[in-house]
């Protein structure tokens, strides 16, 4: 005896589960193709033996690494959290590993993370938002990797897009506020393509319906509570006080409301406020925050469905999947 324990093998798992090594291998690569009762026995045997699959060997032997790269701008105070949490839970349960990378608002950093994911031969790259760099889009199309763009709905996706129209969301908010009688909107816009698309479409729709051009200010990303407070103070620089402030995130809206109330302003009686994202705190604020809701968990479910369909060698019925959005009318506007 040399004192070094022998690592459990795939054969050990097969013997304990009462199946062939080929069945265990099939379960590890595609658990959905193994009968449920057999899969349960194999799972129990893996736990009992402490067996760890050799993922590198599996990658070399087949075409799947079972590694998924998820690239998101940020996760702190993020509207993407529901999507990320549901995605990781579902992918992990299916035997995949998730490589989570933060890209921030820097396009150079995004491209770097995409290249890193490609070099690791991932099975899929999940992007938050739409890649605008044409060279990067061409590189992704040239690789045999599934690419899912989420939280956006480009006309010509790289591979698959799951999201909603930011243009439509901006237009709908403009129509909603006009119908509620507001006349002087002010936009607080995070510096991101998604926020800019919503703000631009809001302004266009507002003026089409006979309103004046909205005033606006820009803030850096990621958006946070403090930006909302600063946004309220910046109203002093405007030629007139707006009657409604359209914030690019619920965090900005929350900070704006807190600062407005500290200054003695009544929300929404003297100034109304809307957010975006329908974060949990939006319904806990006083006043509660009118916001735009996107079902992040549904984005994740559609993502898993797409990956399962493609991994099974089946054809998708559609490559642009619209999960929609809805305005949640609350007390702040």
Where are these regions (language model features)?
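Amphipathic helical "hinge" segments at domain boundaries
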Residues: 51-116, 120-124, 203
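Flexible loop/hinge segments that line or gate small-molecule binding clefts
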Residues: 128-172, 251, 277-289
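N-terminal helix-turn-helix DNA-binding module of bacterial transcription factors
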Residues: 1-65
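Short acidic capping loops at alpha-helix termini that bridge into adjacent secondary structure
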Residues: 184, 213-216, 266-273
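Hinge/beta->alpha junction and helix N-cap segments in small-molecule ligand-binding domains
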Residues: 55, 73-82, 101-109, 161-172, ...
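Periplasmic-binding protein-like
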Residues: 121-129, 186-189, 218, 239-249, ...
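Append "Primarily bacterial transcriptional regulators
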Residues: 13-14, 46, 192, 271, ...
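Flexible loop/turn connectors
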Residues: 238-333
